[in-house]
């Protein structure tokens, strides 16, 4: 099995605590308001804590339509969130899973930095192409910025 790691850092004027609340704790109610149409449907199996599964269907027409996320850990005090993508066409047929570690770090100006480390576990010696990582970064950044704008407005 191959392993590939990628880090995405996004800055925000919104506090780390408020981003964490919207991005992690209340994401299932906030994201549909912040980015209507980002998801076609989300089926949740569990209480939102570790072991919870989120089966996500994305809108028609995109290159990715399905993914299943497993919540691995939520730490409200440390502002960390761990989850894995374990199923769906997002895995492209050559990725076993994508392990994600999210840390919200407060900044001196009252804002925050959202640091996401994605660890791609690939089949054999497969390598995730750079264009796929770029596409994921663009999608994740757009969702983060939509969430940030919603939190600022509300």
Swiss-Prot record:
<comment type="similarity">
    <text>Belongs to the BetVI family.</text>
</comment>
<dbReference type="GO" id="GO:0009738">
    <property type="term" value="P:abscisic acid-activated signaling pathway"/>
</dbReference>
<dbReference type="GO" id="GO:0005737">
    <property type="term" value="C:cytoplasm"/>
</dbReference>
<dbReference type="GO" id="GO:0010427">
    <property type="term" value="F:abscisic acid binding"/>
</dbReference>
<keyword id="KW-0611">Plant defense</keyword>
<keyword id="KW-0020">Allergen</keyword>
<dbReference type="InterPro" id="IPR024949">
    <property type="entry name" value="Bet_v_I_allergen"/>
</dbReference>
<dbReference type="GO" id="GO:0004864">
    <property type="term" value="F:protein phosphatase inhibitor activity"/>
</dbReference>
<dbReference type="GO" id="GO:0006952">
    <property type="term" value="P:defense response"/>
</dbReference>
<dbReference type="InterPro" id="IPR023393">
    <property type="entry name" value="START-like_dom_sf"/>
</dbReference>
<dbReference type="GO" id="GO:0005634">
    <property type="term" value="C:nucleus"/>
</dbReference>
<keyword id="KW-0568">Pathogenesis-related protein</keyword>
<dbReference type="Pfam" id="PF00407">
    <property type="entry name" value="Bet_v_1"/>
</dbReference>
<dbReference type="InterPro" id="IPR050279">
    <property type="entry name" value="Plant_def-hormone_signal"/>
</dbReference>
<dbReference type="InterPro" id="IPR000916">
    <property type="entry name" value="Bet_v_I/MLP"/>
</dbReference>
<protein>
    <recommendedName>
        <fullName>Major allergen Api g 1, isoallergen 1</fullName>
    </recommendedName>
</protein>
<dbReference type="GO" id="GO:0038023">
    <property type="term" value="F:signaling receptor activity"/>
</dbReference>
């Amino acid at each position: 099995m191959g392993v590939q790691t990628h880090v995405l850092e996004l800055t925000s004027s919104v506090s780390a605590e408020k981003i964490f609340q919207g991005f992690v704790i209340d994401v299932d109610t906030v994201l549909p308001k912040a980015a209507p149409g980002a998801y076609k449907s989300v089926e949740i199996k569990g209480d939102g804590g570790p072991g919870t599964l989120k089966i996500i269907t994305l809108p028609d027409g995109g290159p990715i339509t399905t993914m299943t996320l497993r919540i691995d850990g939520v730490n409200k005090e440390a502002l960390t969130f761990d989850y894995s993508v374990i199923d769906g066409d997002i895995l492209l047929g050559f990725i076993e899973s994508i392990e994600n570690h999210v840390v919200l770090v407060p900044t001196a100006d009252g804002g925050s930095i959202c640091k996401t480390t994605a660890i791609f576990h690939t089949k054999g010696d497969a390598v995730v192409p750079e264009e796929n990582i770029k596409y994921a970064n663009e999608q994740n950044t757009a969702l983060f910025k939509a969430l940030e704008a919603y939190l600022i407005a509300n």
